Every structure is written in C-alpha cells, then in structure tokens.
Amino acid sequence: MTWFWKPQPAYRSQFKAEHVNILASMVRRNYPSNHRFICVTDSPEGIDSSIEIVPLWNDFATIPSPHGRLFPSCYRRLKAFSAEAREWFGDRFVSLDLDCVVTGNLAPLWDRKDDFIIWGDTHRTSPYNGSMFMMTAGCRKQVWDDFNPSTSPAITKAMGYLGSDQAWIGARLGTLEHKWTSKDGVCSYRNQIATKGGALPVGARIVFYHGNVDPWSPQAQSLKWVRDNYHL
C-alpha cells in the first residue's frame, strides 16, 4: 500500500495520481505473489480502478514537522500502526513511499516472516527510514497509541532523529527492530547512486528517492535504468 495526499505548495516534491499508478505497475511486475494494491488518499481522481482506495483520515494532519514547515509531515501515517489497520489493509501489509523505483524481484524482501521490519541504513543518527516498512497489522500498536501530538515531535527532535513519523517510530520502538539495508537490495538514490555517477548498485531491488530528486525528475530520468523500470 502507498500514500498520496497533496503536499504543501512549497514542498520539494509534487505528487500526482500518475505516480500511484506507476508504483502499482512496478509492484505487479516485480512481486509475483497474490496481493492487493491499496492507496490511502484524499485525492482518488486519476488513480487506476485496479487500485483499492482507502479514504485518508485527518488524524494528526495539521501537526508540523519539528524541523520546520518546509519539511514533510507524515504523522498521519502512524495510524497504520493502530489495531484498526487490519480492517483496511488486511493481516499483513507493506507501506511504500511513492518516490521509488522498483528494479528487481521484491519477493526476498516481502516474503520474510518478521512481524515488523523497516528500512534502516540511511542516516547515522536515525535508526529507521519510513519509506518502506512491513508488518503484521497491530503488532506495534504502541507507535499509534502512545503518540502525543503535543510532546512526541519534540521528544524525537531532542533525540536527534530526522523526520516526522519515522522519528517517532524510532523513539517508541528503539533501535533493535529488524531492518532492510542495502545488503538486501534496498538502496538510497541520494546516498548510494547520486554520489557514484548514477550507476545502479549490483543486486538492487528497490531504490528510494528521499531527497531533492524524484524518479520523475530530469536528473533521474536521464538514467537508462530508471527509464527502463519507472513506467506503467
């Protein structure tokens, strides 16, 4: 499943329904097991009819990032950790950010049996990156239950963690959860590709663009491996 809501006008990335449709197509091509593709959104127009729509809730919608209003605020995603998530997503689900390119078979990543696993090697001071996580619904409901909009963002900032929801996940769960890393083929465009001439790492299965470049940006589209994979 993925998330699509209209970002603030000044935010670095502007997402579209087309990006939801492309992500669903990449997943279908690279994950052979039977699955549903779900989008949690407040803007279903233009999303392909094969994609299930879950209406986006307003919980924590107005809480700004503790790093400033030009930084993304994704606290709404914390509701995926609630016990209610099973009603929307089923017993087991993967959460994916839109700004990624799937480049290989996802089964070795998603057929694991860990009750919770999250991407986790993108910044030395932050244990996790919320661009992708997989869980058995409700298995870490304390992430949702214990979030206090008045105090939790400040706690994560004081700990030196980056981000909004991902920072709280780290603060509440600690640093010892199972992680995907580049050794599993989960790669960072900013950290592992842009700094090395744009070459796709050997064994890469999925590449995330957690930064100023998106898969649809001219810089990314200049790379053949992006064009070969990022399409309907």
Q: How would you name each of these model-derived features?
A:
Residues 11, 15, 62-69, 125-133, ...:
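Short, charged, surface-exposed secondary-structure boundary motifs
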Residues 45, 55, 59, 75-127, ...:
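GT-A fold catalytic core of metal-dependent nucleotide-sugar glycosyltransferases
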Residues 103-173:
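Conserved catalytic core of nucleotide-sugar-dependent glycosyltransferases
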Residues 33, 49, 77, 96, ...:
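Residues that flank catalytic or metal-binding motifs in active/ligand-binding sites
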Residues 33-42, 92-100, 116-119, 179-181, ...:
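Short, hydrophobic beta-strand segments that form beta-sheet elements in well-ordered domains
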Residues 1-66, 88, 137:
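N-terminal anchoring/stem segment of glycosyltransferases
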Residues 38-46, 102-107, 184-185, 211-213:
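Short, polar loop motifs at secondary-structure junctions
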Residues 141-232:
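Catalytic core and acceptor-binding pocket of nucleotide-sugar-dependent glycosyltransferases
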